[in-house]
């Protein structure tokens, strides 16, 4: 929004031209989201407490989690509010990339909000029925996938980038829709499964978003893209503002979500952030890289799949409890140890993912 104002003011003073630079707006976007989160956080937490919107804790979970019962949830509203404010202020509202991301965050955030509302306000322990949750997620993801496929302006927007191979970028055609769908829905649910400990999901999300900010910047410049053998995607630089807004909002939320948490993000936060990471990966053509950098999310999801599959096929559980972070809790690991070690794994995987840009 302010891009247009700055463009007009440039007529009177060339100093306003600085707002045309993506890097400058990205920094402002991060700071805006961070400061808004820190300012609004205490107010939102107090409001959630007054409304008695507290976390529901399973009776069959780790005993250490019983103390979390009643902790304010739906804190994802803080994250989404900070991201929307930052992107609307500093993003180019003429960019399709910006509107795609706002739609993803808004639609999946609404799905998560409905689920949280049913759980904590209407006291329905099941929340939004799984079937309906999946249908709504699928509908939103397919809308995005079809839109991106039908409005693709150059071949690079529908290619698949394969890490470690600089000349392997097959044209997907209509398969793009299928890949985009599974990436967005899968990432949304993966982050949702990971969000089980204080700060466990938000920090890897911040790390992956920061990495995608760099990739989006490189993809938007022909010289860098050609050097790294990745698709050149004109206009993708606007995704940098979205990514840094996620980083700022995430760090601001972590201020209140760090152990012991004052607030949880709820499904309104985890489903929307996960879908956002998936959508960014689709937009910059780095779906495989998301699997690498978001390895913690993949690990959590695979542990649930293996646990359920093993129990149904053999009648035996592989882990003491799934997702896998609960397995380590039941083994006696203190919650902060599990969290920090998963963060360390995430740092390693994000750096490994970035290294693949050059190792080709």
From Swiss-Prot:
HAMAP family in the record: MraY (MF_00038)
Organism: Shewanella oneidensis (strain ATCC 700550 / JCM 31522 / CIP 106686 / LMG 19005 / NCIMB 14063 / MR-1)
Necessary cofactors: Mg(2+)
Signal peptide: none
Pfam families assigned: Glycos_transf_4 (PF00953), MraY_sig1 (PF10555)
Keyword annotations: Cell cycle, Cell division, Cell inner membrane, Cell membrane, Cell shape, Cell wall biogenesis/degradation, Magnesium, Membrane, Metal-binding, Peptidoglycan synthesis, Transferase, Transmembrane, Transmembrane helix
E.C. numbers: 2.7.8.13
GO cellular component, one term: plasma membrane
Role according to the record: Catalyzes the initial step of the lipid cycle reactions in the biosynthesis of the cell wall peptidoglycan: transfers peptidoglycan precursor phospho-MurNAc-pentapeptide from UDP-MurNAc-pentapeptide onto the lipid carrier undecaprenyl phosphate, yielding undecaprenyl-pyrophosphoryl-MurNAc-pentapeptide, known as lipid I.
GO molecular function terms listed in the Swiss-Prot or TrEMBL record: metal ion binding; phospho-N-acetylmuramoyl-pentapeptide-transferase activity; UDP-N-acetylmuramoyl-L-alanyl-D-glutamyl-meso-2,6-diaminopimelyl-D-alanyl-D-alanine:undecaprenyl-phosphate transferase activity
Gene name of the encoded protein: mraY
PANTHER family in alphabetical order: PHOSPHO-N-ACETYLMURAMOYL-PENTAPEPTIDE-TRANSFERASE (PTHR22926), PHOSPHO-N-ACETYLMURAMOYL-PENTAPEPTIDE-TRANSFERASE HOMOLOG (PTHR22926:SF5)
Catalytic activity field: UDP-N-acetyl-alpha-D-muramoyl-L-alanyl-gamma-D-glutamyl-meso-2,6-diaminopimeloyl-D-alanyl-D-alanine + di-trans,octa-cis-undecaprenyl phosphate = di-trans,octa-cis-undecaprenyl diphospho-N-acetyl-alpha-D-muramoyl-L-alanyl-D-glutamyl-meso-2,6-diaminopimeloyl-D-alanyl-D-alanine + UMP
Subcellular location: Cell inner membrane
GO biological process: cell division; cell wall macromolecule biosynthetic process; cell wall organization; peptidoglycan biosynthetic process; regulation of cell shape
Protein name (record): Phospho-N-acetylmuramoyl-pentapeptide-transferase
Bilayer topology annotation: Multi-pass membrane protein
Pathway assigned to this chain's UniProt record: Cell wall biogenesis; peptidoglycan biosynthesis
Domain of life (superkingdom): Bacteria
Family: Belongs to the glycosyltransferase 4 family. MraY subfamily.
Chain ranges passing through the membrane: 26-46, 74-94, 97-117, 134-154, 168-188, 199-219, 236-256, 263-283, 288-308, 338-358
């Amino acid at each position: 929004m302010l891009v247009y104002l700055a463009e007009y003011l440039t007529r009177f003073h060339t100093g306003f031209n600085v707002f045309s630079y993506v890097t400058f707006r990205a920094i402002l976007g991060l700071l805006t989201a961070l400061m808004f989160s820190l300012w609004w956080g205490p107010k939102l937490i107090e409001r959630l407490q007054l409304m008695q919107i507290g976390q529901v804790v399973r009776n069959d979970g780790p005993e250490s989690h019983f103390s979390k019962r009643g902790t304010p949830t739906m804190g994802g509203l803080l994250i989404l509010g900070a991201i929307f404010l930052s992107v609307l202020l500093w993003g180019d509202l003429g960019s399709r990339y910006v509107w795609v991301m706002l739609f993803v965050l808004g639609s999946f955030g609404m799905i998560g909000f409905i689920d949280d509302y049913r759980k904590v306000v209407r006291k329905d322990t099941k929340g939004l029925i799984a079937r309906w949750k999946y249908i709504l997620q699928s509908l939103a993801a397919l809308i995005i996938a079809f839109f991106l496929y039908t409005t693709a302006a150059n071949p690079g927007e529908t290619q698949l980038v394969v890490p470690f191979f600089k000349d392997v970028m097959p044209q997907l055609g209509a398969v793009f829709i299928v890949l985009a769908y599974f990436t967005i829905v899968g990432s949304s649910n993966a982050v949702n499964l990971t969000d089980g400990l204080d700060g466990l999901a938000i920090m890897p999300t911040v790390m992956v978003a920061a990495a995608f900010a760099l990739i989006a910047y490189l993809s938007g410049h022909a010289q860098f893209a050609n050097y790294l053998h990745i698709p050149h995607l004109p206009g993708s630089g606007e995704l940098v503002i979205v990514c840094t807004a996620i980083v700022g909002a995430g760090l601001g939320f972590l201020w209140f979500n760090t152990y012991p948490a004052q607030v949880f993000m709820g499904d309104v936060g985890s489903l929307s952030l996960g879908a956002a990471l998936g959508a960014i990966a689709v937009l910059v053509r780095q779906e495989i890289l998301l699997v690498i950098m978001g390895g913690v999310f993949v690990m959590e999801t695979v542990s649930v799949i293996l646990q359920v599959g093993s129990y149904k096929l053999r009648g035996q559980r592989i882990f003491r409890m799934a997702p896998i972070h609960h397995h380590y809790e039941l083994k006696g690991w203190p919650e902060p140890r599990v969290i920090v070690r998963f963060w360390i794994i995430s740092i390693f995987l994000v750096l490994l993912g970035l290294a693949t840009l050059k190792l080709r």
